[in-house]
């Protein structure tokens, strides 16, 4: 109670007045159309597509000087052969050598047929490249809030897939559209109402091919026959998936698609394969419960399913928004079919 009072402290007001208060500059935000909702799956697909492009550019052979010289020499040789053939036909006509003219006509028809085949193959390869461009455009539209580009784009996709205007899903999609819908909303509605028709068919093909590969490996005792059968089934699966999505494959376009699928699996699919299959197998100890052939059959079936899933991604015109197929979707089905088959075989 008897403590002495503290001395008074006087503050200078000038220091507070002269002190400059630093404030951040205010930001004025416009309407909501400038903001895009964050979608982690679309971002993951964008990163995967960027990785795939880097892989393709790395694997693409660079044009060297020798290849350019060979190209020029081949062009000169081709022009010389055509000129020589024209001169030979002219001399045969002057000399009335009808046998030579007949041979020249047959050779000309063969050349025309070969050129037609080359043009057809080029068109099919171009169609496969165009599908990749369409997928990139769809990814851009999914981030766009503009109006006027989404509807004709989706109508063109439906036409390419063979879905006519009288299809129930197409009619339901058309009835849900309004003038106020932007491009992103139109594509989302199309991916929810129309695109699942083709996805369901592709999933059924993958399930059937994976089940056949699993049962073939688990039951058949011939390894070489198994390898040939699975290779043939995998090529047929890729052709069937491409046909479902409206892509007609030729010889070189089929090889290109198969190469893209294998490259995608090798570089982008190994981690997903280990994550979805390895941990589940270790937790349930399936390898100990099943025989060696059965385990090999399940592995072959899952690889076939993985190949089909990547073929879907490369042939599908739209990027995945939701319901992306995973190996876990086919794993339980394969195990159940294998157990039923082995159980029936033991009873017999």
Swiss-Prot record:
The chain crosses the membrane at residues 69-89, 99-119. Its main location: membrane. It is found in: Cell inner membrane. It is a multi-pass membrane protein. Keywords: Cell inner membrane, Cell membrane, Membrane, Transmembrane, Transmembrane helix. One of its GO terms (cellular component) is plasma membrane. Pfam families: DUF697. Belongs to the UPF0283 family. This is UPF0283 membrane protein PMI1371. It comes from Proteus mirabilis (strain HI4320).
């Amino acid at each position: 109670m008897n403590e002495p009072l503290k001395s008074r402290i006087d503050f200078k007001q000038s220091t507070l007045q002269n002190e400059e208060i630093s404030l951040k500059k205010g930001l004025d935000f416009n309407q909501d159309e400038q903001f895009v909702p964050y979608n982690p799956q679309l971002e993951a697909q964008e990163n995967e597509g960027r990785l795939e492009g880097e892989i393709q550019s790395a694997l693409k052979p660079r044009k060297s000087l020798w290849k350019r010289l060979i190209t020029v020499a081949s062009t000169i040789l081709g022009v010389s052969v055509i000129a020589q053939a024209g001169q030979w036909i002219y001399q045969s006509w002057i000399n009335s050598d009808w046998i030579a003219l007949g041979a020249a006509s047959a050779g000309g028809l063969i050349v025309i047929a070969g050129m037609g085949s080359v043009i057809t193959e080029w068109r099919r390869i171009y169609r496969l490249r165009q599908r990749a461009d369409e997928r990139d455009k769809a990814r851009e539209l999914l981030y766009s809030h503009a109006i006027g580009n989404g509807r004709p784009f989706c109508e063109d996709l439906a036409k390419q897939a063979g879905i006519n205007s009288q299809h129930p899903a197409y009619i339901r999609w058309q009835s849900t559209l309004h003038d106020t819908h932007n491009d992103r909303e139109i594509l989302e509605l199309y991916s929810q109402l129309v695109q699942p028709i083709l996805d369901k068919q592709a999933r059924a093909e993958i399930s059937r091919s994976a089940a056949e590969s699993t049962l073939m490996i688990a039951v058949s005792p011939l390894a070489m026959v198994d390898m040939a059968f699975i290779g043939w089934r995998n090529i047929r699966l890729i052709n069937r998936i491409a046909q479902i999505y409206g892509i007609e494959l030729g010889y070189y376009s089929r090889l290109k698609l198969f190469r893209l699928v294998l490259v995608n699996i090798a570089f982008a699919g190994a981690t997903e394969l280990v994550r979805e299959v390895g941990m589940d197998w270790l937790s349930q100890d399936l390898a100990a419960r099943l025989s060696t052939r059965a385990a090999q059959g399940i592995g072959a079936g899952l690889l076939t399913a993985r190949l089909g899933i990547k073929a879907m991604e490369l042939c599908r015109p739209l990027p995945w928004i939701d319901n992306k197929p995973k190996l876990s979707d086919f794993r339980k089905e394969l195990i159940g079919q294998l157990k039923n088959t082995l159980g029936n075989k033991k009873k017999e």
